[in-house]
């Protein structure tokens, strides 16, 4: 059976790949699989981002769920972490988010959460796929047993309350918020304003025709320009910026000079603060194989270890849970803090980071100054075969680079999960050296692929 789920739920072009028929089937199968052994009276929470196709797919998913006899609570436009949090807070049977995150406007997606607010395991996803493929045994309610769809937009306030709880007084800050015309268009600016910040919101409308278009965490240029403009106009103000993606499960930042503060920088600041108050479980942060070696070095000076997972917040979360840890993330801005939520939470991350800036009465630039980002070279080699990395010549080329770099750098050569590419990444302090080494390895891969 072909896989329906990808690395983060089901995604595709709305009404082409991800049709209402498939959405209905997923709603029906998901409800049956995830609630088979639970309380039959517990509803399923459903949320969405601002995409134009969101209401169409929401209606189909809700219909599929209702056909099994399960009620739904539609919370409207809310960030993905909001659906996860609300699902757990109201003790729902499950949660569903309709979003394609940072993908283009024509795409959409469906992801499920268990009653605890965590994303599904591979086994649960396969069970749903099997039920979509063979729905004969699924329940089909009739008469008074058909599920009822209820609007419950007010439940988004439960998520909002968790955002501002424990946040610092931000009245010393001017925060430019780029909401990407997405799910955080309301809750993001509102949270910072509630905590006292002067808020300048851009791309903060419910506009699914422009979600992620030249804005948000995938394009920081407008945000950086606005931060610099306000900083020049208000020299006595402390201006900084935060950008979310379409479903606000990630956040990136811009400091007072317009420089980008990525997820590695954020992890350093938050992990350091957690360790100081004794709240960093295992004194370990889970990053990914793409986390810069500069982060590893900076954490080490704080007595913090860096464990590495595969690329993707799904794999960061798996490593956290497997190792009994609570904090990790990615360069892309997915930060998972199991003290606060069960998934990446852009607004939650932003409140936590800006609270540290305000409490320590410092600048974002100063907070991340301990992280010296090592130069990184990333080359992509197009290949037709998937066994290229198994060849002796490629393995020896990688080993040779590892010996030459020693503790002063690292190499990662991996197959792309989405394209016919081999990615060659080398980090080190000498840019000319790592450029030479990366090109040598890439050429070896090219020859081996012929």
Give the ranges of each region predicted by the language model.
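An N-terminal, well-structured beta->alpha segment
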Residues: 1-63, 67-68, 149-175
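Gly/Ser/Thr-rich active-site loops/lids in small-molecule metabolic enzymes
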Residues: 119-121, 201-205, 259-278, 345-356, ...
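Short glycine-rich phosphate-binding loop at a beta-alpha junction
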Residues: 39-49, 73, 174-177, 283-289, ...
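Proline/glycine-rich low-complexity loops and linkers
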Residues: 81-82, 126-161, 165, 256-329, ...
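N-terminal small/polar loop signature for handling phosphorylated ligands or for N-terminal nucleophile
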Residues: 32, 36, 40-107, 161-162, ...
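Gly/Ser/Thr-enriched, mixed-charge loops and adjacent short helices
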Residues: 13, 108-236
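General beta-strand structural signal in soluble alpha/beta enzymes
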Residues: 5-6, 46, 72-77, 97-98, ...
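Phosphate-binding and adjacent anionic-ligand microenvironments
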Residues: 240, 277-450
């Amino acid at each position: 059976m072909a896989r329906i789920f990808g690395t983060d739920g089901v995604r595709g072009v709305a009404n082409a790949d991800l049709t209402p028929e498939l959405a209905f089937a997923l709603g029906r199968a998901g409800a049956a699989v995830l609630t088979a052994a639970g309380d039959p009276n517990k509803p399923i929470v459903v949320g969405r981002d601002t995409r134009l196709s969101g209401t169409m797919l929401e209606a189909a998913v809700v219909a599929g769920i209702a056909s099994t006899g399960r009620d739904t609570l539609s919370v409207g436009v809310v960030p993905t972490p909001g659906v996860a949090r609300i699902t757990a807070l109201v003790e729902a049977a499950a949660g569903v988010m309709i979003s394609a995150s940072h993908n283009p406007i024509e795409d959409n997606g469906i992801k499920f959460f268990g009653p605890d607010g965590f994303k599904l395991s591979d086994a649960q996803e396969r069970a749903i796929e099997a039920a979509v493929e063979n729905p004969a045994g699924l329940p089909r309610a009739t008469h008074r047993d058909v599920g009822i769809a209820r609007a419950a937009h007010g439940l988004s306030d439960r998520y909002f309350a968790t955002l501002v709880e424990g946040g610092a007084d931000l009245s010393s800050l001017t925060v430019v918020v780029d909401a990407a015309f997405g799910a955080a268009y309301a809750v993001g600016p509102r949270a910072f304003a509630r905590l006292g910040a002067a808020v300048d919101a851009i791309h903060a409308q419910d506009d699914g025709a422009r979600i992620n278009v030249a804005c948000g965490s995938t394009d920081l240029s407008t945000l950086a320009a606005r931060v610099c403009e306000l900083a020049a106009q208000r020299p006595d103000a402390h201006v900084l910026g935060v950008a979310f993606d379409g479903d606000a499960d990630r956040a990136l930042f811009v400091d007072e000079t317009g420089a980008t503060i990525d997820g590695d920088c954020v992890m350093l600041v938050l992990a350091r603060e957690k360790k100081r108050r004794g709240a960093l479980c295992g004194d370990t942060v889970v990053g990914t194989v793409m986390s810069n070696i500069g982060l590893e070095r900076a954490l080490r000076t704080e007595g913090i270890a860096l464990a590495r997972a595969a690329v993707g917040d799904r794999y960061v979360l798996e490593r956290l849970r497997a190792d009994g840890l609570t904090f990790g993330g990615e360069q892309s801005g997915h930060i998972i803090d199991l003290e606060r939520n069960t998934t990446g939470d852009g607004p939650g991350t932003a409140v936590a980071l800006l609270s540290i800036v305000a409490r320590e009465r410092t600048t974002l630039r100063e907070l991340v100054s301990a992280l010296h980002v090592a130069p990184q070279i990333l080359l992509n080699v197009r290949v037709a075969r998937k066994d290229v990395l198994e060849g002796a010549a490629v393995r020896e080329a990688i080993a040779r680079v590892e010996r030459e770099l020693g503790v002063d750098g690292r190499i990662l050569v991996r197959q792309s999960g989405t394209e016919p590419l081999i990615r060659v990444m080398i980090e080190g302090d000498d840019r000319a050296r790592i450029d030479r080494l990366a090109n040598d390895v890439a050429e070896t891969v090219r020859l081996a692929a012929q």
